[in-house]
Amino acid sequence: MASVHPTAIVEPGAQLGANVTIGAYAFVGADVTLGAGCVLHHHATVEGYTQLGPDCEVFPYAVIGGRTQDLKARPGKPGLKVGARNVFREYVSVHLGTQEGEWTILGDDNTLLAYSHIAHDCVIGSHLVISSHSAVAGHVHVGDHVNIGWNAGIHQFCRIGDHAMVAACSKCVQDVPPFVIADGNPCETKMINVVGLTRAGFTPDEVATAKTLHRLFYREGLNASQALEKARTLPEASGRIVQAFAGFAAATKRGLA
């Protein structure tokens, strides 16, 4: 059974899962679905056509499911789908998709720190940590196990690959490949995320392969097509590191940071 503070507003039509807790002065809109065990702290807002999976936590003054800021938005019912165990700290904002039938999507186990922002139509994987005051613009795709540092900005339509780290205060206007650390204004790939890969259970040989790819793409004077062709001839070409990196590079439309 849900526990709802008497000062909270839960509009008729909202669907509350088992053991949901809604604090003082929180707001839940009519089209919201809250999974079992979700916690909304005082003054938290979940609105719009929003679906939160189980055990999500929304801290004070966060607004989850707000209307997009995209000027192309038209009346309709775009949505937001959020997986399990996501944490939205104070003043976080996550917006709906732009058009009817379009969605902003977050996976599982993401942590969004205070004042961070996820814009319309983004597709976010799982295990993201986005630091305070950072912003991800519309239509950005972020992989799994990504870290985005304080006050970073990610341009519209960019992609960030799995296990990548974007350093604090970076401005990303191109795609950040998997497994790397990117930094700067504009953001550039600097090195392989060795600590992150090791913590994630990648083997020393796989980390070495990632370093080889970094040299191919960034240190040997090759253009992206040449580096990609050479990467596919490596002895490790069938392994998950080369497959992920090469596949990401081949699909880029904005170029690689």
PLM region spans:
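Terminal amphipathic alpha-helical/low-complexity segments used for targeting or macromolecular assembly
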Residues: 1-7, 12-13, 18-19, 55, ...
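Structural signal for interior beta-strand "rungs" in well-ordered beta-sheet cores
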Residues: 2-183, 187-188
